[in-house]
C-alpha cells in the first residue's frame, strides 16, 4: 500500500512539473527525472556555479563594476545578488530599478546569470530592508512584541497592509524583469525574502496572533496530515500522533503544548505569507522561486534560533502552505554538510545551496553537493571577498565541474556520485555498476608532506560512470581503488589518462602510469591538484588453473 501511495505521489509530482513547464511564460523552470532535478532555460539544462554577494555590495553600481569581471575570472557562471526594497521603493508606489538594471547589464557583459534575492519584509528575521515609510508607521505596519511587551524591528506576519505592500513591490520587480529580460533570460531564479524566522519567541504573541493560535488548525493542513499520514516526515508525524492524530482542533489539541507547536503555527503563517508574495510575482513573470533558512544550532530552542523558517523538521508545513515556492534551501554556516543536505533532499525537495561560509573547504564541498545530491547549484557567501587559497581552490573546482557539467546535464552517464573526505572521514565506499569503489583522502597514503598534519584539507571528487568499465574521476586530493562485486574476478586498471574537456570533447593530455597510479594499484589525484582522469578497467579471473 505504501509503495502504491508513493507511486501516486511521484506521478502527481511529475505531472505537476510538466504543468509548470507548459504554463511557464519565462521559459525557465525546474524539472525532475527520477531523482535528478534540473534547472532549464529554453529547454537547455543549466548548473549554477555561483557566489552570493555580501549584503551591501549591490547597493552601488560603481562598487559593483569591478566585481563582475573578478567573479568571472573565478569561473562563476551565476551571481546571487540582493534587491533592496528600501532602495527600490524609497517612496510608496515610486519605484527605482536602476540597481536592478545595472546588475543585469553587468551580468550580460560577462555572460553570467543572476539569481535575485528579494530583501523584502524580512532579512535574517529582521525587517531592516523595509522602506523608511514603513518603518516609521508601526500602526499601519505592526511589529512583533516579546514576552515583556517590547516591540522589535520585525514586522508581524499578520500585518495585512505589510503583506499587500510587499506583494505590490515584488510584483513590480517581477514585471520589470519580464519587460527587460524575458528575451535574454539573464535572471534565472528569485529568492523570496531572506532567512525568514521568528526571534525572540517561538511564535508571535500579539492579540491578533493569539486569536489565530487559539482557533482551529486550518482544514488545508489537517487534510494534508490525513492524506499523507504514512509518508509524513517523522518530526511532524510524531507530534501529531502523540497528541492523538486528531482530524481537527486547535493547534495545541492537534500538536500538543510547547515551543514545537508554537513553531509549527508560526511556520504555517510565514509560509502562507511567502506563498502570497511568490504567487503574485509569478503572475507577472513565472521564474523559479525559493526561500532560504538559517539553520538552528545544536541545543537552541525555537526563538533562540530563528524559529519557523523553512527548516527540515517543518518542511511538510512549508510545502503544503507554499505551493508557489519551487524549493526550500539551506544556508550553511554549519560544518555538518551531509546531515543537513540529507534532510533537505526529503519530500522531493530539490537541493540548491544559496549560501555557504566562504572558506577553502567550499572547493571540495562543491563536488560533493553537486555530485551526490544532484544539486541545482552551489554558492558561497560574500564571494567578492574570496582571495588567496580560497579563491584558487574554488576557481579550480568550478573549472573542473563546468567541464564535466555537459556530461551531467545531457545525461550521458550510467550513474554519477560525489564524495567528500577529510581526516575524520578518510575513506568511503560506493557501488557503481558491477564495481565497489573505495575513495580515500590522498593523505591516507602517507606520502605527502601534509599527511602528518593534525588537520587535513577537505578533498572532494565527482565520479561519473560512462559505460560498464569506463569512469571519469574529477576532483582533488583523492585515491580510488576498484573491486569487482564478483569475487571470482579481479579488477585492474587498463588505462588512466589525464584529460580535459572542451566544448564537450574529451582531449587527451597525459597517460598516467607507474608512480602516478602506483603501478596500476589505484587512481590518484594529489592534494592541491585538480584533475579530470579517464579510467578504463578490465577484469581477469581471480584464480587460474
Model regions and ranges:
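Catalytic-core region of carbohydrate-active enzymes that cleave or remodel glycosidic bonds
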Residues: 276-287, 313-411
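Polysaccharide-binding and catalytic clefts of secreted carbohydrate-active enzymes
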Residues: 140-315
Amino acid at each position: 500500500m505504501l509503495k502504491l501511495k508513493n507511486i501516486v505521489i511521484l506521478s502527481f509530482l511529475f505531472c505537476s512539473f510538466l504543468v509548470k513547464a507548459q504554463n511557464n511564460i519565462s521559459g525557465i523552470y525546474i524539472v525532475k527525472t527520477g531523482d535528478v532535478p534540473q534547472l532549464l532555460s529554453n529547454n537547455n539544462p543549466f548548473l549554477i556555479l555561483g557566489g552570493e554577494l555580501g549584503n551591501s555590495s549591490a547597493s552601488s553600481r560603481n562598487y559593483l563594476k569591478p566585481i563582475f569581471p573578478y567573479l568571472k575570472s573565478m569561473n562563476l557562471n551565476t551571481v546571487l545578488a540582493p534587491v533592496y526594497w528600501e532602495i527600490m521603493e524609497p517612496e510608496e508606489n515610486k519605484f527605482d530599478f536602476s540597481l536592478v538594471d545595472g546588475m543585469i547589464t553587468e551580468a550580460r557583459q560577462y555572460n553570467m546569470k543572476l539569481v535575485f534575492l528579494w530583501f523584502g519584509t524580512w532579512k535574517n528575521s529582521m525587517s531592516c530592508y523595509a522602506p523608511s515609510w514603513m518603518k516609521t508607521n508601526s500602526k499601519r505596519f505592526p511589529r512583533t512584541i516579546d514576552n515583556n511587551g517590547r516591540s522589535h524591528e520585525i514586522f508581524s506576519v499578520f500585518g495585512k497592509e505589510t503583506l499587500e505592500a510587499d506583494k505590490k513591490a515584488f510584483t513590480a520587480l517581477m514585471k520589470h524583469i519580464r519587460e527587460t529580460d524575458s528575451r535574454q533570460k539573464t535572471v534565472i531564479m528569485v529568492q523570496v525574502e531572506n532567512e525568514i524566522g521568528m526571534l525572540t519567541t517561538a511564535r508571535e504573541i500579539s492579540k491578533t496572533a493569539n486569536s489565530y493560535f487559539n482557533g482551529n488548525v486550518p482544514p488545508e493542513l489537517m487534510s494534508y496530515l490525513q492524506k499523507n499520514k504514512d509518508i509524513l516526515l517523522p518530526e511532524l508525524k510524531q507530534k501529531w500522533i502523540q497528541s492523538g492524530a486528531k482530524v481537527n482542533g486547535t493547534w495545541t489539541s492537534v500538536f500538543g503544548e510547547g515551543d514545537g507547536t508554537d513553531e509549527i503555527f508560526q511556520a504555517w503563517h510565514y509560509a502562507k505569507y511567502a506563498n502570497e508574495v511568490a504567487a503574485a510575482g509569478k503572475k507577472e513573470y513565472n521564474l523559479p522561486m525559493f526561500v532560504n533558512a538559517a539553520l538552528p544550532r545544536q541545543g537552541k530552542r525555537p526563538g533562540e534560533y530563528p524559529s519557523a523558517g523553512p527548516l527540515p523538521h517543518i518542511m511538510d508545513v512549508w510545502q503544503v502552505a507554499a505551493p508557489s515556492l519551487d524549493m526550500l534551501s539551506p544556508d550553511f554556516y554549519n560544518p555538518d554538510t551531509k546531515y543537513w543536505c540529507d534532510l533537505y533532499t526529503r519530500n522531493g525537495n530539490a537541493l540548491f545551496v544559496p549560501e555557504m561560509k566562504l572558506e577553502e573547504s567550499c572547493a571540495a564541498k562543491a563536488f560533493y553537493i553537486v555530485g551526490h545530491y544532484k544539486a541545482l547549484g552551489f554558492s558561497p557567501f560574500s564571494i567578492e571577498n574570496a582571495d588567496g587559497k580560497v579563491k584558487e581552490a574554488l576557481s579550480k573546482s568550478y573549472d573542473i565541474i563546468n567541464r564535466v557539467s555537459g556530461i551531467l546535464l545531457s545525461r550521458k552517464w550510467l550513474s554519477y556520485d560525489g564524495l567528500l573526505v577529510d581526516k575524520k572521514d578518510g575513506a568511503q565506499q560506493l557501488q557503481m555498476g558491477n564495481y565497489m569503489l573505495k575513495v580515500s583522502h590522498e593523505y591516507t597514503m602517507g606520502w605527502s608532506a601534509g599527511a602528518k598534519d593534525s588537520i587535513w584539507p577537505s578533498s572532494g571528487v565527482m565520479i561519473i560512470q560512462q559505460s560498464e568499465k569506463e569512469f571519469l574521476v574529477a576532483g582533488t586530493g583523492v585515491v580510488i581503488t576498484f573491486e569487482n562485486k564478483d569475487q571470482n574476478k579481479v579488477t585492474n586498471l587498463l588505462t588512466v589518462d589525464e584529460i580535459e574537456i572542451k566544448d564537450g570533447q574529451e582531449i587527451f593530455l597525459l597517460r598516467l602510469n607507474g608512480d602516478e597510479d602506483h603501478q596500476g594499484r589505484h587512481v590518484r589525484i594529489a592534494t592541491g591538484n585538480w584533475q579530470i582522469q579517464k579510467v578504463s578497467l578490465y577484469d581477469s579471473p581471480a584464480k587460474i588453473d
